[in-house]
């Protein structure tokens, strides 16, 4: 179990994470739609996650969403590295009605993000541009090379959920045990 805590003038966040979990979630960010996305992530990654965030929501959701990505990414980094006996690479395509999202990732300990998804609009009060901010914060703090690409769809709720679920499934696959892959790199270290 990895525990992380971060407090700034804008947010206070605590995370408890178990990557070998069963998808249990206890999420409270004060942002209902974001909570729903994080619950979808835990369910489909099979990671147990407790994430509590108190943020300056009266200003904007940006600080809370990005900072949750920072702390979650930091917890993932601690849980994942050093890598031994796992697949390392993962990919998935997830559909939700008319929406389809693709995710490919590498637990490379090298941070990179390609995000080709919706950037304008809202789901309720949630600015859709925050999706990219969240995934960037996760990727850069976890040391993940992450490619998330919209394949089709218009409904912003469906697209968002497909993106989170696709990331979850790809991460679950990358974390899958592979007893033959002592260190899955020709460098001998990740």
Curated annotation (Swiss-Prot):
Family note: Belongs to the imidazoleglycerol-phosphate dehydratase family.
Cited PANTHER family: IMIDAZOLEGLYCEROL-PHOSPHATE DEHYDRATASE, IMIDAZOLEGLYCEROL-PHOSPHATE DEHYDRATASE HIS7
UniProt KW keywords: Amino-acid biosynthesis, Cytoplasm, Histidine biosynthesis, Lyase
Matching SUPFAM superfamilies: Ribosomal protein S5 domain 2-like
Chemical reaction(s) catalysed: D-erythro-1-(imidazol-4-yl)glycerol 3-phosphate = 3-(imidazol-4-yl)-2-oxopropyl phosphate + H2O
Source organism phylogeny: Bacteria, Pseudomonadati, Campylobacterota, Epsilonproteobacteria, Campylobacterales
Gene3D superfamilies: Imidazole glycerol phosphate dehydratase, domain 1
Subcellular location per the Swiss-Prot or TrEMBL entry: Cytoplasm
Name under which the protein is recorded: Imidazoleglycerol-phosphate dehydratase
EC numbers on record: 4.2.1.19
Top EC class, one word: lyase
Keyword Lyase set for record: yes
Single GO MF annotation: imidazoleglycerol-phosphate dehydratase activity
Gene Ontology CC terms: cytoplasm
GO biological process, one term: L-histidine biosynthetic process
Biological pathway: Amino-acid biosynthesis; L-histidine biosynthesis; L-histidine from 5-phospho-alpha-D-ribose 1-diphosphate: step 6/9
The species this protein was found in: Campylobacter hominis (strain ATCC BAA-381 / DSM 21671 / CCUG 45161 / LMG 19568 / NCTC 13146 / CH001A)
Keyword Translocase: no
């Amino acid at each position: 179990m990895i525990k992380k805590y971060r407090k700034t003038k804008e947010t206070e966040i605590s995370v408890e994470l178990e990557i070998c979990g069963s998808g249990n979630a206890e999420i409270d960010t004060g942002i209902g739609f974001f909570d729903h996305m994080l619950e979808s992530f835990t369910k489909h990654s099979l990671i147990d996650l407790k994430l509590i965030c108190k943020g300056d929501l009266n200003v904007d959701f940006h600080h809370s969403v990005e900072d949750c990505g920072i702390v979650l990414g930091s917890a993932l980094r601690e849980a994942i590295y050093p890598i031994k006996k796992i697949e390392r690479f993962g990919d998935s395509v997830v559909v939700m009605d008319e929406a389809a999202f693709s995710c490919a990732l590498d637990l490379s300990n090298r941070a990179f993000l390609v995000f080709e998804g919706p950037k304008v609009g809202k789901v309720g009060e949630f600015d859709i541009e925050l999706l990219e901010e969240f995934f960037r914060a996760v990727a850069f703090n976890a040391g993940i090379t992450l490619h998330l690409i919209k394949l089709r769809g218009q409904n912003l709720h469906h697209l968002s959920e497909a993106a989170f679920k696709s990331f979850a499934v790809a991460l679950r696959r990358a974390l899958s045990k592979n007893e033959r892959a002592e260190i899955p790199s020709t460098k001998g270290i990740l």
